[in-house]
Amino acid sequence: RYLNKHKEYLNSLNVFPVPDGDTGLNMVLTLQGAMANMKNFENQTMLPGEYLKNFAEQMLLNSRGCSGVILSLFMQGFAEIVQNNDFSKENVYRAIENGYRNAYEGTENPREGTMLTLMRALKEKYAELMEEEDDPIVIISKTIPYLKEVLNKTPEMLPVLKQAGVVDA
């Protein structure tokens, strides 16, 4: 819902790799398609890790545009690790790390200043915060201010963003 509410704003920031103004829409359609297809699993009892694995597969099948594909690849890598239902802080870190690696390796020409940068920053800040927190939800929540800082630096990493006066969508 949050993403859908802000998709037009994201679309307005979309200048890289193609300035076609559809980044927000592509991510929304990717998630909506995956959620709609998860109705096929309604009558099945699934543990959270198994649900995430199926959801990530549906995201990839329904992915739209570069942003939808990269988001789907991250979720696939993440779900691959937590499908065992181990949501300890260490395993969530491994899942984030695997999600980032999967998204990075699955991107034809990975560039700093994009959503890949935010995924890497999440991985790095999560690792740092693991030293002081045990709850993965709290750790992820505490990464948000740092991720906003990194996002605000994306124009310095990718000249096309600086030229347009925007952060990465």
Predicted regions and their residues:
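N-terminal loops that bind phosphate or other acidic moieties
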Residues: 1-169
